[in-house]
């Protein structure tokens, strides 16, 4: 293992450097002041202790903001064991602060793939035996998958899973469809206060920040291609536009494609006539040869494939703000091209072969090895953005824990294994706390107005079908 374990009475942790704890604690205190919804829930439910008895396995980016989430769960009665969901996303000072507080955490920036899985397993195990966990909080679905594949006995006690991101939700839905999902789950990702804040506004803030920190490039006047125009793509396109880039968008969904056009972006395809037939001849080399920066945002596989990588302009920057590194064909790059590390999470990928020639100018600049760029090359979304996402996680954990799925008779369990979105009333509760944090005042409906539009005075205010 590459990280150092520092026993000091409490040893149920592994972080890079426990001496960073004081720095981490100072940043956590600042983050708390920027997370009004999460801190509001902490105050609102502290006396009630709605998570008393909950034992939560957590696998989500081990950042300063996540530290506030962890300590909120504990303040509401839970015990937790934690790891990061990405090998590059841990902020070592945050992990150290959590460990110093006596909370089991296994995470450090720059884990190997083997260390990453080891860290997840250390949360599942305590003293070498499966911990009696009864809740799961996941981001991307790796923890959920490992539990189903290797520790199905743990799932017998689990009341539910709350999933943070698009990729993890896709995996849950695939498991549900295939009949392999063993416990109910809440899709936190599609809560309005998550998807519109984290996915859209968060990426608007953090994408250009990461690129500038990694490259020191001026982005103005250069051409960018954003692959995907869902909420993450929308925020990413805005992030690059506000830097003065000339932004083009590629999409497969006609509705999202229409939105890109209506938002003033040129809709293009990296393939001639939009058709990828698997040959290099189908790649629009004329288009890609002018692109200075390409970013993938889709949660899909090989959306920046080998043919596209070959056709990109010399010295183009390549990055991903989706969850996994398979959006970009990094496997092809490893097999065929030379990698030269410029600094941590910044590589020159030499397209002239496996040999690295420092004088060669035919290279790409790959950020975070194709993994999540905003956490690999910067510090991710700001606290105020993550406030909404993590408040949703807290309410989702409370909701599933109260349902007590694991205590149901066996005959009733199958029909209760679902993947649901957080109830709208809870989504509105998070939004209201966020508005209060901005100093905003929400106007209340009169009884007559509420009756006229067919809602309760206290909400919910929109049907589930409403698109914000």
Swiss-Prot record:
Protein location: Cytoplasm
GO cellular component: cytosol
Enzyme class, broadest EC rank: hydrolase
Cofactor: NAD(+)
Known catalytic reactions: S-adenosyl-L-homocysteine + H2O = L-homocysteine + adenosine
Purpose: May play a key role in the regulation of the intracellular concentration of adenosylhomocysteine.
HAMAP family: AdoHcyase (MF_00563)
Protein name: Adenosylhomocysteinase
Species assigned in the record: Stutzerimonas stutzeri (strain A1501) (Pseudomonas stutzeri)
């Amino acid at each position: 293992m590459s990280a150092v374990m520092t026993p000091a009475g409490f040893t149920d942790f592994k972080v890079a450097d426990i001496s960073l704890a004081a720095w981490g604690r100072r940043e956590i205190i600042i983050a708390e002041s920027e997370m009004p919804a999460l801190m509001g829930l902490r105050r609102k439910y502290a006396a009630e202790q709605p998570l008393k008895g909950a034992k939560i396995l957590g696998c989500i980016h081990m950042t300063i903001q996540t530290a506030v989430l962890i300590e909120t769960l504990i303040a509401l009665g839970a015990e937790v064991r934690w790891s990061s969901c990405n090998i590059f996303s841990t902020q070592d000072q945050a992990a150290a602060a959590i460990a110093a507080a006596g909370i089991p955490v296994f995470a450090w920036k720059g884990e190997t793939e083997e260390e990453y899985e080891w860290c997840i397993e250390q949360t599942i195990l305590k003293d070498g035996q499966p911990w009696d966990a009864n809740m799961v909080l996941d981001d991307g679905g790796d923890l959920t998958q490992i539990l189903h594949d290797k520790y199905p006995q743990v799932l017998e006690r689990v009341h539910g899973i709350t999933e943070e991101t698009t990729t993890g939700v896709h995996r849950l839905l695939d498991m549900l469809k295939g009949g392999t999902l063993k416990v109910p789950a809440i899709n936190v990702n599609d809560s309005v206060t998550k998807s519109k804040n984290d996915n859209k506004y968060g990426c608007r803030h953090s994408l250009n920040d990461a690129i500038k920190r990694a490259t020191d490039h001026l982005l103005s006047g250069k051409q960018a291609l954003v692959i995907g125009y869902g909420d993450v793509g929308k925020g990413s396109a805005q992030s690059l536009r506000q830097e003065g880039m000339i932004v083009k968008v590629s999409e497969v969904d006609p509705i999202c494609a229409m939105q890109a056009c209506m938002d003033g972006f040129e809709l293009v395809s990296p393939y001639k006539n939009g058709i990828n037939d698997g040959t290099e001849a189908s790649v629009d080399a004329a288009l890609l040869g002018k692109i200075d920066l390409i970013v993938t945002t889709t949660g899909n596989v090989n959306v920046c494939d080998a043919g596209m990588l070959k056709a990109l302009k010399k010295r183009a920057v390549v990055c991903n703000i989706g969850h996994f590194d398979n959006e970009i064909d990094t496997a092809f790059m490893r097999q065929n091209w030379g990698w030269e590390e410029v600094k941590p999470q910044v590589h020159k990928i030499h397209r002239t072969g496996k040999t690295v020639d420092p004088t060669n100018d035919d290279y790409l600049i790959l950020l975070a090895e194709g993994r999540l760029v905003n956490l690999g090359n910067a510090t991710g979304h700001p606290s105020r953005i993550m406030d909404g996402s993590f408040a949703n996680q807290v309410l989702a954990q409370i909701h599933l824990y109260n349902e007590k799925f694991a205590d149901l008779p066996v005959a009733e369990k199958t029909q209760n294994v679902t993947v649901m979105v957080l109830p709208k009333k809870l989504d509105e509760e998070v939004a209201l706390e966020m508005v209060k944090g901005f100093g905003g005042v929400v106007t209340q409906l009169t009884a007559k107005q509420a009756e006229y539009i067919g809602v309760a005075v206290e909400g919910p205010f929109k049907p589930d079908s409403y698109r914000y």
